[in-house]
Design a protein with these regions (language model features):
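Nucleotide phosphate-binding/pyrophosphate-handling subdomain across enzymes
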Residues: 1-56
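Residue-level signal for inorganic ion chemistry
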Residues: 12, 34, 59, 106, ...
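Short glycine-rich anion-binding loops that position phosphate/pyrophosphate groups of nucleotides
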Residues: 38-41, 65, 103, 109-113
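C-terminal helical cap/extension that packs against the catalytic core
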Residues: 46-102, 136-137
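Glycine/aspartate-rich loop-and-adjacent alpha/beta segment that forms the canonical ThDP
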Residues: 109-136
Length: 137
């Protein structure tokens, strides 16, 4: 999406399953703040959360999947777990937690149907929230 204040934002809203998120996380060699959640597909999460634990510095869960994601993440030893009640709040929190060189990645591991009609709409909301944040400086 964009980079400002040396924090890079990536829109991977199309990542609607855990395998896609793992591939996205594997692509980065910098610290990642992961924004995940949405309509819960009720897939097993233990292996996924082990990858999240080793590939992220912070995790922000949102949407209807947030409760289950957080519960499994805690069980699997994931540290630095946060919650957001909206995309705008998730983007703002991701930026607040980031340091220069970090990545804020929207890669939900869920479908979008709890808050949005499709993954494209979710991705557009993410991009708009990032632009708003950038405009505020």
């Amino acid at each position: 999406v964009t980079t400002f204040h040396d924090v890079t934002f990536y829109n991977d809203s199309k990542a609607t399953n855990t395998d896609s998120v793992v591939k996205a996380l594997d692509a980065f060699d910098k610290p990642v703040i992961l924004l995940a959640g949405g309509h819960d597909k009720m897939t097993p999460l233990e292996d996924f959360m082990n990858i999240v634990k080793s590939h992220t510095k912070e995790v922000i869960f949102m949407g209807e999947a947030a409760d289950r994601f957080e519960s499994v993440a805690v069980k699997m030893g994931v540290q630095h777990i946060h919650r957001a009640q909206s995309m705008k709040a998730a983007v703002a929190l991701g930026y607040q937690l980031a340091k220069a060189g970090d990545i804020v990645l929207l890669s939900p591991a869920c479908s979008s149907f709890d808050w949005y009609s499709c993954f494209e709409e979710r991705g557009e909301d993410f991009k708009n929230c990032v632009r708003e944040l950038e405009e505020r400086g």
